[in-house]
Amino acid sequence: MPAWTNQKILNTALKQSATDLGCKPEDFLRPDSIVVASQAEPRARKYLELPFSCNLVSYGNNVVASTDEAYRDLVSAYIHRFPPEHCFETPNLHILNDALQKKGHRVCFMAEYFLPDLSALKPIRCWEYELRLLGP
């Protein structure tokens, strides 16, 4: 198996995000934000409850929104109103929340994931630390 590289890590993350959202990995690299229809996908991360009502993901270039068709227009208007980096901030998120709340939903979970930069990782000398088994 080839060694991991920053590019391989990014490609793996893009592929999994695309599976989860129902788009193509290259959609995250486009210059424009897009909306795709959310759908059930057996290869998605198991803890996700699909289809999404609304899920926004950005790798920095744009926002890919995976939504139920009932929210497509309002989510599209939202992600095209602000630059990608501002779609995930308050007070802008309040605008999305207000629109979703009129349809019985609210903004709920926010998560940030960071990909490692392999050039910044340094070996840790774990053998220098004492190992003890703790008990009652």
Tell where the protein language model's regions lie, with residue ranges.
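Contiguous mid-protein beta-loop-alpha structural module that forms a pocket-lining wall or clamp
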Residues: P2-W4
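Acyl-donor-binding surface of acyltransferase catalytic domains
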Residues: T12-G135
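Early transmembrane hairpin of solute transport permeases
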Residues: N6-K8
